[in-house]
């Protein structure tokens, strides 16, 4: 499956040219933003880790081995990509134990930048946001056109698609999810089950968002929409008054789409009809998610780009800096600008 099938149409028109992303790890930098004051005491050792050429799970295994503890005692807030320079927090549960020597975990691919104690472990999804610094190299596009589109994106946001990398190479994760859904069965391995259920939900969300992008309503509240604030998981239904809420215009409040689970779409009016039609087309996937015990949640359709700045270090290099809420994809922004040219034989651009 191609990117258009897995995501949907662009919001701002065709790509303005092409570029390479991640020719080196430094071209894709991610800093986890964690709004948790650390107490300096407790049985959990929190580590601020810089890694390159190493994914989060591999880093956790290295830390566990060096600390002499079970992998189950090592926690992290979110998964970060292997092909990047990333900085993120880990925690290690060490009840009644002194800080271990973690030197064996460190080399040119992993550095521990800070270590401190806290009373609680790091929970999945605990980070508030991710800060990105991207360098698009071998840029073949008109700078004036890029600048104009970035100004529009800063003012209006972008469709909050799950990135193509969520679906695996050529959509392989989705193919696997459909296969399991056709049998209404679940993989026994927990990590495989979690990955494929997440893939199915992401695809259904993208389908609903694609329909809203196609009809031009992805950033407009309609009566029956379920609205949510950027950093909130709660939502409320829009009536006529809510559709003119000034917080919509300043990108604080947004229409949402379905993360499918038990029951019909809780949206109303035309929005309910659109989402239910999508669910009817993908009945096997929806029934599979319900059978797996997933509850219905919502995700904002429009993604505001925090602190967006850009410049050109060289005529053929575009550097972007911005902040996104946790769980959102930097490649969704890049996609609105240019087509990415694969580096060597690499087909997947990044994990955000």
From Swiss-Prot:
Active site annotation, chain numbering: 81 (nucleophile)
Keyword Isomerase in annotation: yes
Single GO cellular component term: cytosol
InterPro entries to which the protein is assigned, alphabetical: PsdUridine_synth_cat_dom_sf (IPR020103), PsdUridine_synth_TruD (IPR001656), PsdUridine_synth_TruD_CS (IPR020119), PsdUridine_synth_TruD_insert (IPR011760), TruD_catalytic (IPR042214), TruD_insert_sf (IPR043165), TruD_pseudoU_synthase (IPR050170)
GO aspect biological process, one term: tRNA pseudouridine synthesis
Superkingdom of this protein's organism: Bacteria
Enzyme Commission code: 5.4.99.27
Molecular function terms, GO-annotated: RNA binding; tRNA pseudouridine(13) synthase activity
Function in brief: Responsible for synthesis of pseudouridine from uracil-13 in transfer RNAs.
Stated family: Belongs to the pseudouridine synthase TruD family.
Listed HAMAP family: TruD
Name this protein carries in UniProt: tRNA pseudouridine synthase D
UniProt organism field: Pseudomonas fluorescens (strain ATCC BAA-477 / NRRL B-23932 / Pf-5)
